[in-house]
Amino acid sequence: MATNIRKTHPLFKIINNSLIDLPTPANISIWWNFGSLLGMCLIIQILTGLFLAMHYTADISSAFSSVAHICRDVNYGWLIRNIHANGASMFFICVYLHIARGLYYGSYLNKETWNIGVVILLLLMVTAFVGYVLPWGQMSFWGATVITNLLSALPYIGDTLVQWIWGGFSIDNATLTRFFTFHFLFPFVTAALTMIHLLFLHETGSNNPTGLTSNTDKIPFHPYFTYKDLVGFFILLFLLTLLALFTPNLLNDAENFIPANPLLTPPHIKPEWYFLFAYAILRSIPNKLGGVLALVFSILILLLVPILHTSKQRSLTFRPITQILFWLLVTNTIILTWIGGQPVEQPFITIGQIASITYFSFFLILFPIAGWWENKMLNL
């Protein structure tokens, strides 16, 4: 009998083992769809970004005008720009849901996969930040000023580091040029890290909602999950199209329609919505260095989750106490997102401080204690 080329060809064999004949747990739910959705988001962002880069000018005198030119004069430029800007929002929605799935079902116990995932998240956040600076509107300029200035809080090297990143003594043309370079480069680095993420995942195989081993009950990825994932693709594309065509500026800041002016500070400097939870944590600490550390650890704390896992069970499916804590953490993060978009005044300051303390408490104290308590109750 002739052997199938997809199983013998050196390149096709890799694709086959990753996407076609991959043994997949039969019971994985729609929450396992977000990995492939993120892959699609990355491809959409790279393609739309590539076409935008063909018409964009990385120069402070013409950056803002070049974005206006793309939207007005380039064929379907408005559509490409709207898909790229709103695609970033859809990307982060999928990222946060993907992480939440990992936390809920204990996927973080695949340590290598989880750790490389956290690195991908950090790289995505840097990519989105430098990309937000490129239109050179008011919020682009002042957002870049505020966030890069945070590095000056680092002892001894801070000021030198900030000037090195700026390429001068203030945010100027050199800064915009290098930010454009980084924004172009990082998505390809992200794609490479995604391959490593998948490599580590396929070493252990996917987790499943029960958190139990699924070696006795696996089915091929194609056709079952290729078609299941296609449903997710269509839903995501529908939502993205809806956003890009009907309310393209819903998630934008109106301040960014004003060209950057170093002499005029906007009333409220804030990042895009997907960074507001971390921004709220940053602002809730009165000390500059303390705020920067809290900001960094709000993401890096994910690296501690596998170490602080105390339960005998992997998933939260059969752990009602930790389930309640998980949904409280989700609510807490939503509250932080809301606070991040509010002005720095009472009662928002106090709410932000309480929400920041509880955010870290969930990871460092409450989840480990709940896991230990549930173990005790299992022994009753």
Curated annotation (Swiss-Prot):
Instruction: List the disulfide bonds in this chain.
Output: none
Cofactor(s) listed in the protein's UniProt record: heme b
**Which UniProt keywords are present, listed alphabetically?**
Electron transport, Heme, Iron, Membrane, Metal-binding, Mitochondrion, Mitochondrion inner membrane, Respiratory chain, Transmembrane, Transmembrane helix, Transport, Ubiquinone
Give me the segments passing through the membrane. 34-54, 78-99, 114-134, 179-199, 227-247, 289-309, 321-341, 348-368
Binding residues annotated for a ubiquinone, in chain numbering: H202
Give the binding site residues for heme b b562. Answer: H84, H183
Q: Name one Pfam family in it.
A: Cytochrom_B_C
Q: Where does it sit, as one GO cellular component term?
A: respiratory chain complex III
For this chain's record, the cofactor binding note is: Binds 2 heme b groups non-covalently.
Q: Which GO terms describe its molecular function?
A: metal ion binding; ubiquinol-cytochrome-c reductase activity
Reported function: Component of the ubiquinol-cytochrome c reductase complex (complex III or cytochrome b-c1 complex) that is part of the mitochondrial respiratory chain. The b-c1 complex mediates electron transfer from ubiquinol to cytochrome c. Contributes to the generation of a proton gradient across the mitochondrial membrane that is then used for ATP synthesis.
| Subunit note | The cytochrome bc1 complex contains 3 respiratory subunits (MT-CYB, CYC1 and UQCRFS1), 2 core proteins (UQCRC1 and UQCRC2) and probably 6 low-molecular weight proteins.
**Additional remarks:** Heme 1 (or BL or b562) is low-potential and absorbs at about 562 nm, and heme 2 (or BH or b566) is high-potential and absorbs at about 566 nm.
Q: Which protein is depicted? A: Cytochrome b
**Which gene is annotated as encoding this protein in its UniProt record?**
mt-cyb
